[in-house]
């Protein structure tokens, strides 16, 4: 097989799309990724780069043009790296995304599951409720060029909300008027790194300036410009990020004006969103995604469910509608605070939130001897660590619902789950990111069925060959849990769910008032005899909730 030569032209047909949204052709048995290509087009392809296992090229002549090709509707397309599919019609984009998920599950995951029809967006424009504009060293505000960190100034983006574009224009005015320098990644110098905008369904915005320092010059004037540009802005926050590299979010935040968080309503639940909290960027499609996750969970009202990587607790509260109890885990402290606040505001009582990574949450569940019926995971693009998958399998849930934003790592993780006995049963792609290569997927996994079974006929009652019912009752009594519910367990539960602490004496007082024994905390009993404060009504209800949770009452 002769090697492809750089700067040579070859003729081939585009077969499909790569994970990066490029066309895929095969020339002399070698894979070539082709820019600005559409499936089915017969092209003369100029090879521009040749690597060991793949080459890159671009079409210089089309002998046939796909009916799915369209003129890009954005003047920045091809320079800005934000979109990948503006040269395709939406039907072809959806085909490409579903096929990408199918290929990942089949080739990488070794699964025979068929991906169901992709759930496309009714509105593929102006859908992003979170905008992140990098600022260059020469104070350009826009988006990165494809596969680089060179900023392309973009005044109007078809993916962002109009408020975000207006706020970006106000920042440009501020940088120019007050001679404030942008940040240079290569030298670590400069001040303004990113403009971050969150917008809710009502059109209100929360603005954050990420800076390489502790403050900005002319902060009052900046706030005035931003509020003038987007009058429905509810707060302006300064995020401090002095770390080298390209990380966006800050280590700490200071409110310059207004609120430090935004509220939104998703799936009928009010959600509190501070700057670091994870929240899906496409509101209508997020409701579709979470609805499908709830369907796959198959809840009946009796289950204990766990939501790992819970972010601001949106999926947790959705699951809580149909589960007995839901535990959410998240490593970002601000997100946990938002999740607890949202649950309290919504009156959702059958949830609790634990701060920590997925492994920490799994360890806490094991310590409490809790075995969830359903585990839902929604990890970042890197997917699940092997030890997290092992921990999930060790808890032996009946179902695992995997929400993924990267088909590649999803396929890898599906294979790891299969090695531990959990097979993919259903899969559906949901388009939360129209005009880009990114796609969300929901996969249902459950433990594989046994290889065979034996039919056994059992007769209950007295007599030869029958099983006495008295023996069954006796054995059942022997298998009852002997775990003692400690005051420490009750206190930890309340702190995790409600975000406040309770004194041991408060628990003892509530137990006493309920007529429960208190012999396991003699010091608390002694404290009840002394003059002291009594628990508030809120804490009494929290203690009762914990006692119900552990089956004490």
Which positions does each model-derived feature cover?
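Phospho-regulated, low-complexity intrinsically disordered regions of nuclear gene-regulatory
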Residues: 532-553
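Terminal RNA-binding accessory module
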Residues: 1-76, 306, 352-353, 360
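DNA-recognition alpha helix
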Residues: 486-498, 508-514
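Short, aliphatic-rich beta-strand segments
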Residues: 153, 197, 203-212, 270-274
């Amino acid at each position: 097989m002769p090697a492809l030569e750089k700067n040579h032209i070859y003729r081939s047909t585009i077969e499909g799309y790569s994970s990066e949204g490029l066309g895929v052709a095969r020339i002399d048995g070698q894979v070539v990724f082709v820019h600005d290509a559409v499936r089915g087009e017969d092209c003369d392809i100029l090879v521009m780069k040749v690597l060991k296992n793949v080459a890159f090229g671009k079409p210089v002549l089309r002998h046939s043009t796909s009916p799915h090709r369209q003129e890009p509707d954005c003047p920045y397309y091809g320079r800005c790296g934000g979109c990948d599919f503006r040269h395709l019609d939406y039907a072809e984009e959806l085909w490409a995304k579903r096929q990408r998920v199918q290929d990942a599950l089949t080739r990488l995951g070794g699964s025979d599951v068929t991906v169901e029809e992709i759930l496309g967006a009714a509105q593929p424009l102006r859908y992003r409720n979170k905008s992140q504009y990098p600022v260059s060293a020469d104070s350009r505000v826009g988006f990165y060029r494809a596969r680089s960190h060179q900023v392309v100034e973009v005044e109007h983006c078809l993916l962002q909300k109009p408020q975000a574009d207006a706020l970006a224009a106000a920042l440009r005015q501020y940088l120019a008027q007050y001679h404030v320098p942008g940040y240079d990644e290569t030298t670590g110098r400069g001040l303004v790194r990113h403009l971050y905008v969150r917008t809710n369904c009502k059109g209100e915005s929360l603005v954050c300036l990420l800076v390489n320092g502790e403050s900005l010059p002319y902060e009052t004037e900046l706030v005035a410009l931003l509020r003038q540009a987007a009058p429905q802005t509810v707060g302006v926050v300064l995020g401090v990020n002095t770390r080298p590299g390209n990380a966006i979010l800050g280590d700490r935040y200071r409110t310059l004006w207004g609120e430090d968080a935004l509220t939104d309503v998703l799936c009928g639940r009010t959600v509190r969103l501070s700057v670091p909290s994870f929240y899906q960027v496409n509101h209508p499609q997020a409701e579709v995604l979470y609805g499908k996750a709830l369907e796959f969970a198959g809840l009946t009202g009796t289950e204990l469910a766990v939501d790992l990587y819970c972010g601001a607790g949106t999926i947790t509260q959705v699951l809580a509608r149909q589960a007995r109890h839901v535990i959410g885990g998240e490593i970002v402290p601000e997100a946990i605070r938002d999740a607890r606040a949202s649950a309290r505001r919504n009156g959702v009582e059958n949830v609790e939130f634990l701060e920590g990574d997925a492994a920490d949450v799994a360890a806490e569940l094991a310590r409490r001897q809790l075995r969830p019926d359903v585990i839902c995971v929604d990890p970042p693009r890197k997917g699940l660590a092997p030890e997290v998958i092992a921990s999930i399998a060790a808890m032996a849930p009946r179902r695992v619902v995997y929400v993924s934003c990267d088909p590649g790592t999803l396929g890898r993780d599906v294979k790891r789950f299969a090695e531990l006995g959990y097979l993919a049963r259903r899969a559906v792609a949901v388009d939360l990111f129209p005009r880009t290569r990114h796609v969300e997927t929901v996969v249902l996994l459950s433990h594989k069925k046994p290889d065979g079974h034996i039919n056994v006929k059992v007769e209950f009652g007295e007599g030869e060959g029958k099983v006495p019912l008295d023996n069954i009752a006796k054995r059942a009594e022997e298998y009852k849990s002997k775990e003692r519910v400690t005051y420490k367990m009750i206190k930890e539960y309340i702190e995790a769910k409600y975000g406040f602490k309770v004194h041991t004496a408060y628990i003892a007082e509530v137990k006493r008032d309920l007529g429960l024994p208190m012999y396991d905390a003699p010091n608390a009993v002694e404290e009840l005899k002394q003059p002291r404060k009594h628990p508030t009504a809120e804490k009494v209800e929290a203690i009762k909730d914990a006692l119900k949770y552990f089956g004490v009452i």
